[in-house]
Amino acid sequence: MEHRSYMRGGPGPSIVPVALLLLLLSPHSLGAGTSQLAEERDVEILRKLPHNSSSFTQGLEVQGKSIFESSGLYGHSRLSEIDSQNGEIIRQVSIDDSYFGEGITVKDQSIIMLTWREGLALEFDISNFSIIGNFSFEGEGWGLCYNGEHMVTSNGTSELSFRDPNSFETDFTLLVTWDGNPVSNLNELECVDDRIYANVWMEDTILEISSNSGIVKSYASPISISSTQGKGPEEVLNGIAFDQDSGGFWITGKNWTEMYLVNFTISEVKLSPDESSVFPALVAASGVTIASAILLFRVILKKKEPETPNFKDSHR
């Protein structure tokens, strides 16, 4: 005997309209598929320090109460230690005129400094700034940070190289994308946990990048700061260092007169005039979609109900 459920022929509601309703109300149907888009961050200034305007800043790093800075240009490249309380230079050392200093990072008791086109990374003793070693690498050197496992370097392209900290050999590269598009001109870097913060050369932009996927998670545009600094075309925003004591970031630029301790805060939603006119239309369209789904749901349910006999045609 074939057993059939008596429920199959009953007038109960079908799962089809319910599924349809849920589909229409899902985030994807309402245009919420933008979760991969980078979020904007506001820049909150916490403190200011005077900055040596002769410094063509290439890298910043905070260690304790000191800020270490590398300055570039052939014949003018140097490494400096700055007091984070008053901005005074504690000490500095110039490097060979044939080297163009670039990004720096701290590893144990050493400071590593990239050079631009010389294919060398110089290792300094952090206690006395003497050069105690170097590493060779191919291509240009721009930004550098250390995440505890890899030395991460940029070369002005959209790729970051993750290097063995002992040999400086490249273990792998990571393509950086912003809303699905590669980001070129990646410059100064700062590693913080599983994130990499990057300046973009010639732009007033700081990116927060996932070191796992290369996707830009958020961005900040400190235009209110950079608009008061740097009058020449080369005097751009560059230099970012995480300050563990305050939880903020020190930022500055090439030949700027000040350094700024900032926080990146969640940005308030600001709609442009065009977006303001589109948003109500999207809401209205969503309302129509929901209303249509409910109406369809009711129609299907009604068709499932037993029909009342047409007594005009009934034999009873």
Where are these regions (language model features)?
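Beta-strand-rich domains and repeat architectures in extracellular enzymes and scaffolds
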Residues: 46-78, 93-105, 253-255
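Surface-exposed loop and turn segments in beta-propeller and other repeat-based domains
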Residues: 47-50, 90, 94-97, 173-182, ...
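Beta-rich, blade/repeat-based domains predominating
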Residues: 53-64, 97-108, 137-148, 154, ...
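A short helix->beta-strand "capping" segment at the edge of beta-propeller domains
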Residues: 35-54, 86-88
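Secretory targeting signatures
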Residues: 1-36, 189, 269-316
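Blade-level signature of beta-propeller repeat domains, shared across WD40, Kelch, NHL, RCC1
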Residues: 239-273
